Amino acid sequence: MVSAFGLMGLLHTRKRSEEDTDVTRRVGDRIGKLWDIAHQGMRENRFLRAEKALLTILKIDEKNAPAYNRLGILYAKQKEYRDAIDCFEIASSIEATPSSLHNLGLIYYETENYERAGIAFEQALKLEENMAARHVAYAKVSEKLGNEKLMFSALERAIELEPNKETYSLLQKAYVERGMEAEADMIGEKLKKLIVPAGKPKRILRPRRVVI
């Protein structure tokens, strides 16, 4: 009798486990389809359709950081910056990634909130330091904040990571704008002789705008 009850309990547990697995699979399939709709809507500039799909994902999984990140990009495209900032802040609080923090910094920069932009770019750099575009963004906001030392340091680091015409030209421009002709001429000479090393990009690699 005891063994019969034990067997029934085992079967019941196994049935519950199978049911849970089936529910998880169905939810996963639904979220996958919603992502397809969201991506298609973004590609076709059908923003309302994409927004509805992303909001539905967040109803199912309220801690889905990639969905908040993508929703932030959608709002930014429509210049709804306050909503974009909210989304990127939530995404970063759930899962701080270089992409979500960089996106947050870009929106703060766009809305002229340079101090917060600088903080966001710094946090992104702590997580991913080896991308020139992140240093260029940090250089731009440092310039706005009047910190030329940080600006030049960031531009020089960008050149170390990706020594190409674009990174050198940005540093040269910064020198010219400050009347630092000798330094600008030195960069000009380097540009004339520049040979981009094998395996290095010829233009600045831009960060992915979202991680899924």
Model-predicted regions and their roles:
Residues 67, 100-101, 134, 167-168, ...:
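TPR alpha-solenoid repeat register
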Residues 23-83, 93:
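Alpha-helical segment of the N-proximal tetratricopeptide repeat
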Residues 1-33:
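Long, contiguous interaction/recruitment modules in multidomain scaffold/adaptor proteins
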Residues 43, 77-78, 110-111, 144, ...:
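Register position in tetratricopeptide repeats
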Residues 62, 95-96, 129, 162-163, ...:
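Short coil turns that delineate tetratricopeptide repeat
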